Amino acid sequence: MANVKLFDQTGKEVSTVELNDDIFGIEPNESVVFDVVISQRASLRQGTHAVKNRSAVSGGGRKPWRQKGTGRARQGSIRSPQWRGGGVVFGPTPRSYGYKLPQKVRRLALKSVYSAKVAEDKFVAVESLSFAAPKTAEFAKVLSALSIDTKVLVLVEEGNEFAALSARNLPNVAVATAATASVLDIVNADKLLVTKEAISTIEEVLA
């Protein structure tokens, strides 16, 4: 079992936390992480691109000139693709780019990124993040006390709204619950700040 230092909100070390090696101590599988990140980024695409094909362009119902006898090339519609103002051939249509990977793959990717953060000493465990009211300044003090000045993902337990509200105006700070944090969220962060309760939730979800 790997041990990480456990801090309180003032930055004081209070004890250590034992981490499950099956989740936080595996050999990271970079290939699987790559596949999951690509999948999650694809799902974020809006996919609302659209152009008009010849059936969608207004007009063009009448044959522009008779089939034979004019000396010109035969034409059936002024909205054919070769005409200026005509429809687009095989253009983009609205669609979803999202696709799902097997659950085992997604879980392995999560274990890989958590293990990588622990191995790189970018995993900061805190006893709790409790605030009497949403205060950005108070959350900034916590980050300063823990010497966190880079892009950080804060993982909290479900229902800790004050922590999320306190952090949302801070640059380079993102907040997610332990059960919903994605591989993309974790990869995008330089450090993880995780509450003790959130660690238990992660171990329950990925056990």
From Swiss-Prot:
One of its GO terms (cellular component) is ribosome. One of its GO terms (biological process) is translation. GO terms for molecular function: rRNA binding; structural constituent of ribosome. Disulfide bonds: none annotated. Pfam families: Ribosomal_L4. Residues 49-78 are annotated as: Disordered. One of the primary rRNA binding proteins, this protein initially binds near the 5'-end of the 23S rRNA. It is important during the early stages of 50S assembly. It makes multiple contacts with different domains of the 23S rRNA in the assembled 50S subunit and ribosome. Forms part of the polypeptide exit tunnel. This is Large ribosomal subunit protein uL4. The gene is rplD.
